[in-house]
Every structure is written in C-alpha cells, then in structure tokens.
Amino acid sequence: MRAMKASCPGSCGELFQCVVDGEEFLMSYGIEKKSQVVIGPQTGAIEEVLRPKMLQVINELTDQIDFGYTFHTDISVGKGYSSSTADMLSILGAYSAYKHGTVSVPLLTSLCSKIEPSDSVGFSDWTVMNPLNGAIQWQTRWKPKLYVYILEPDQMVDTTSFIRMTESPLYPAEQSKTLLTDFKIACDKQNVELLGAVATRSALLNNKRLPKPYLNDIIDLVNELGLLGVNIAHSGSIVGILLTEEQLMHMTELEERLSHHPLASYYSLRNLSKILYDGLQVKNVEEILE
C-alpha cells in the first residue's frame, strides 16, 4: 500500500473575524509555514510523538493507530498561527487518503472544530466559516497576490482560553457584522484596498476584547507608508502587515522604522511570507515508509 503525504499551511491569524446574528465567522489565509504528515504501513519502528489534538481528532475516524507515520511542522504554537488546525488537518488528510482514497476538506475541517475552534486554512479558496462547527458561510475564487510581514512576540498564549466574541461584553459584535459584507464587496470588486481596510477594522474592533501592544502605532506606520493594512490573530498574539507585490519596495523602510520603535523588543521575531492558496494538499509518496 502506497504511503500518503498531507500538508496544510498555517496562517497569520485571521484576515477578519466577526459576529453576525449571534454567529461567529472568520477567514484565514495560508502562509509559508506548514504541518506535514506521512502515513503508510506499520514498520515496527518507534514512531514520533503526535501532538494531543492530533490524537484526539484522529479518534474521530479510527480507534486504533494501525499505520506508520511521520510528522513535521515549522509552525510555532501558542501564537495564533493556526498550528492546531494545520496539524489536525494534516493527519486527517493523510489518513483519509491512505485508508479511503478520498479527502473532503469541509468534512475534515468540521471534525477539527469538534476538538477546538478552527480556522479555514484547509481550503485552497478563501473561505469564510464558523470556527465552532466548520460550517462554510461564503467562498471566493479571487486570489490576490499578497504578502504579509509577520510580527511575532516571544510570549506564548493559550489561544483557546479567551472568551468567545459572542460571549465577551468587551467585543462590539454589532459593529463587527458589516465586516462580512465589506469583505464580500472587496472580493467581488477584487479591490485590495477595501480588503486591507476590512482587516484593519477587524483588528481594531478585536483590540477592545484582546488588546495587542502597539497596535495603533503599527497601523499609523502602515498608513504613513501607504501599505495595505493590518490583520491580527484574534485569539492569539501575532500581527500581520499586509502588502501588495508593488509595496515590497517599502520593506527596507518598514523594517527600519519598526526596529527603532519600542515595539521591536516586544515583536522580536519578524519575517515576510507570501500569502498562499495551497490549502490541504495530499499526494502519494513514492517510497513506502521504512
């Protein structure tokens, strides 16, 4: 039996997150960090340790680990990179392909949501979904060529411990519901400026629930340089500065300004990523696991 490899990208938080009629929605985008799982026949070798949520979610499909596997990821945990969703989708995708020869991203995403609130990183099209049950609200085939400069603090947080938007008295849910409409308009018009405005507004609204240090300073700098906007991990600690390909020419000045600001010591890890549209990818592995 041929081994199967599945990979799923992480995300720099969410492009936006909102509440509409008491229901929570979000849209995540892929970045150049991923989780990867290979599943094949058992070999008797000592296997790597799977993360607890990967074991929890695979139990939704099988009650026995009767296969060999390897697991690798370069996604940091406890920051808002969608690491758990990427991990869970990778093992579910590899297992589904290995055992059943078919993979349904909507189904697997809904299984992830049973374990914890999840992100839409498994979809190759931008997908707005309910993180609590994985239900799809809206999708677009528009794939703008964008980049994100990720600002990451050293601090780790329990991204599942925060009060949900629908339950937080600090979150302006009524104001947030227009984010979904405005996101759809931006996509239908294929207007990246509107897209950036949606992301920035979502970040500011969420700042009342989970404040990000220096967020207003970051937004001011982005506006000064004429960049696209700012997005955040709404239940995490990372911040993303969104750029078009043409705006990459401002990267040197952007980093220069950031490095001389007090925020540089807090967001000490900073790196540029292309925004990807890979979603969950599954393929055959030529060699059987040894």
Question: Model regions: which residues?
Answer:
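ATP-dependent small-molecule kinase catalytic core of the GHMP/sugar-kinase superfamily
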Residues: V103-L228, T244-E290
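ATP-binding N-lobe of GHMP and related small-molecule kinases
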Residues: M1-K79, D278, E290
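DPxDG-like acidic metal-binding loop motif
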Residues: K79-V105, V121
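Short, flexible, solvent-exposed loop/turn segments with mixed acidic/basic and small polar residues
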Residues: Q36-V38, L227-A233
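Short beta-strand segments
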Residues: P9, S28-G30, F123, I150-D154, ...
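Short beta-strand scaffold segments in enzyme catalytic cores
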Residues: C12-C18, S35-G40, V121, W126-M129, ...
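Small/polar glycine-rich anion-binding or flexible loop at a beta-alpha turn
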Residues: N216, A233-G240
